Swiss-Prot record:
It comes from the Bacteria. One of its GO terms (molecular function) is lysine-tRNA ligase activity. Its cofactor is Mg(2+). Mg(2+) 1 binds at residues 415, 422. The gene is lysS. The lineage of its organism: Bacteria, Pseudomonadati, Pseudomonadota, Gammaproteobacteria, Lysobacterales. Keywords: Aminoacyl-tRNA synthetase, ATP-binding, Cytoplasm, Ligase, Magnesium, Metal-binding, Nucleotide-binding, Protein biosynthesis. Binds 3 Mg(2+) ions per subunit. Its main location: cytoplasm. It catalyses: tRNA(Lys) + L-lysine + ATP = L-lysyl-tRNA(Lys) + AMP + diphosphate. This is Lysine--tRNA ligase.
Length: 505
């Protein structure tokens, strides 16, 4: 027996409305016209509104003289029956348009219209006119019902007031909440703009496996699955990094992928177990050039999609036009914690005392690098409102980044923070196979010590590095968080069409 999603209990009045609509559908079935599929539209509502926006030019007389015949289809969002004439509004993907309906023109179709419900999907054919109030309207010469809606839409004045219902029933949210629809249209434009930006700079888009033999590319807990035919445990990828860098070894010097990652971790306003990442690699680039690239692609995407580089996000006004600040992690920690000296930043015992003073919980396996990161996350991260690159992370928490030539224990790595949220992570890639093998081994020891997010040892990746990887810079940008920034959304669920939710009871 297959599991089924439980049907939510409905209020009695809603059940009665559904029963009425089912009866209407039954009548349509009896007439053999329940779900017709032979209508071809010629126009969209939004296009007509844009083309004939000038009311002074396109008067009712001018529109009727133009004799433009249009065929539209959409969802019935409002109706006002007034005896021999009525008005209605339909909505398609582009917007809304008013319909002017006359009984003496439509005949039986007008009679049928009186029994239709808001939410039904209809088709209309006719010419254009403008009402006395100046509203562009389709003067219907033919009208048909294409799809009977069995469930009533939410009240037009209150919409979907239950946020959880908006996420669970995104299909309803998109119908009744124009702002939600606009977020997802912008999301598509943002991703398209990023692709165009990278393609114009000779980056090659690639696809790498979604199921891995060995989880790697990020410190995160993976989802596991099983391949029955091979009798093999596999992992949904936490990041595509190691596969993309194998391609750099193979001579594809500029590669990128925009795709899903999966991490078996907590759910919050910033985290969803399944999320979209841009990850790219460029041979012969350092983390300085990758920071330049990150700054420019975000700025250009904002300008291209929004027409501005100034955005408001979660109560903060963000300006993406000025150069993003670049700040070493240890310097940022010392700035916000004057009690911590430069020497303390690499002294495990000193950092343990500071963590205890700051009431930061730590594990016995943490070295000074992990402790420094914990202090940064607790005391600095939330203060970074304007775009800031936090650079030079400790080796301990950067197992794939190139070690600094001048600062022992640190790496050539950055993370980008805006309004206290991490949006990007990048570094000069570690291309020394022996150093990488040692770092993998340290991660294995950390995993044995209880760190379930530590990486596994990937022998094939070490073999790839042994063939030689050019000096390379890499970058990962969280697309979901970038969309949050550019749409002013405060929860990651607002920018995911179908965020993960607990099953309904």
């Amino acid at each position: 027996m297959t599991e089924q999603t439980p049907t939510p209990q409905l209020p009695a009045d809603e059940n009665s409305l559904i029963a009425e609509r089912r009866a209407k559908l039954g009548a349509l079935r009896g007439q053999g016209i329940a779900y017709p599929n032979d209508f071809v539209r010629t126009h969209f509502a939004g296009d007509l509104q844009a083309e004939f926006a000038e009311a002074e030019t396109w008067t009712a007389e001018a529109l009727e003289a133009a004799d433009r015949s249009v065929k539209l289809a959409g969802r019935l969002m409002a109706k006002r029956v007034m005896g021999k004439a009525s008005f209605a509004q339909i909505q398609d993907e582009s917007g809304r348009v008013q319909l002017f309906l006359q009984g003496n023109v439509l005949g039986d179709a007008y009679t049928a219209f009186k029994g239709w419900d808001v939410g039904d999907i209809v088709a209309v054919e006719g010419g254009l006119t403008r009402t006395k109030t100046g509203e562009l309207s389709v003067k219907a010469s033919a009208l048909r019902l294409l799809t009977k809606s069995l469930r009533p839409l939410p009240d037009k004045w209150h919409g979907l007031s239950d946020v959880e219902q908006r996420y669970r029933q995104r299909y309803v949210d998109l119908i009744v909440t124009p702002e939600a629809r606009e977020v997802f249209i912008k999301r598509s434009k943002i991703i398209r703009a990023i692709r165009a930006w990278l393609d114009a700079r000779r980056f090659l888009e690639v696809e790498t496996p979604m199921m891995h033999y060995i989880p790697g590319g990020a410190t995160a807990k993976p989802f596991t699955t099983h391949h029955n035919a091979l009798d093999l445990d596999l992992y949904l990828r936490v990041a595509p990094e190691l596969y993309l860098k194998r391609l750099v070894v193979g001579g594809l010097e500029r590669v990128y992928e925009i795709n899903r990652n999966f991490r078996n971790e907590g759910v919050s306003t910033r985290h969803n177990p399944e999320f979209t990442m841009l990850e790219l690699y460029e041979a012969y680039a350092t983390y300085h050039e990758i920071m330049d690239l990150t700054e420019q692609v975000i700025r250009d995407t904002a300008q291209g999609v929004l027409g501005t580089t100034q955005v408001s996000w979660d109560g903060a006004d963000i300006d993406l036009a000025p150069a993003f600040r670049r700040w070493r992690m240890d310097e940022a920690v010392r700035h916000h914690n004057p009690e911590i000296s430069a020497a303390d930043c690499t002294d495990r015992a000193a950092l343990l005392r500071h963590c205890e003073r700051l009431k930061i919980k730590v594990k016995p396996s943490y070295g000074w690098g992990k402790l420094l990161l914990e202090i940064f996350e607790a005391t600095v991260e939330h203060t970074l409102v304007q775009p800031t690159f936090i650079t030079d992370h400790p080796v301990e928490v950067s197992p794939l980044a190139r070690a600094s030539d001048t600062e022992p224990g640190y790496t050539d790595r950055f993370e980008l923070f805006i309004n206290g949220k991490e949006l990007a992570n990048g570094f000069s890639e570690l291309n020394d196979p022996e150093d990488q093998a040692a770092r993998f081994q340290a991660q294995v020891q950390a995993k044995d010590g209880g760190d379930d997010e530590a990486m596994h040892y990937d022998a094939d990746y070490i073999r790839a590095l042994e063939y030689g990887m050019a000096p390379t810079g890499g970058l990962g940008i969280g697309i979901d968080r970038l969309v949050m920034l550019l749409t002013g959304s405060t929860s990651i669920r607002d920018v995911l069409l179908f965020p993960y939710m607990r099953p309904e009871a």
